Amino acid sequence: MAPQEATTHQDERTLTVERVQIGVRMEKRMLKVLKGLAEYLDITLGDLLEGITLHAFESQTPFNEETRRRIAQLKDVYGMDYGAEASHRFVELTTGTAKDVGRGENR
């Protein structure tokens, strides 16, 4: 796979990176909010996830107040009625069994 160039926002120099295709499972409503936010920001879902991750790694908030208001609207639209407090508490129902998704343990 050929490396893709990404422009850094701090100093406008380019940083050559190699991106890979991944397959991940996410909570459905959260994914809808993320896709809606990426569309609103006119960036790809991958770029959004990279930005969120880089900010989280440095204990920085990735969004300004206006974007947080948009996120709240998208959460309402898509019925995402939980927040960070739900982290590691998701239970996935699959063919009649419950699986603790947050920690990968079976219940």
Please give the residue ranges for each predicted region.
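Charge-rich, solvent-exposed alpha-helical interaction surfaces
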Residues: V33, R70-Q73, R89, L93
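Short Lys/Arg-rich basic patches
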Residues: M1-R25, A38, D76-E85, E92-R107
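N-terminal low-complexity, intrinsically disordered patches enriched in charged
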Residues: K32, G51, D76-V77, H88
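Short, basic amphipathic alpha-helical segments that act as recognition/interaction helices
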Residues: L41-R68
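Short, contiguous, helix-prone interaction/anchoring segments in small proteins
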Residues: I22-I43, D47
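Short interaction-prone segments
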Residues: E65-D81
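Intrinsically disordered, low-complexity regions of eukaryotic proteins
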Residues: R13-T14, R29, I52
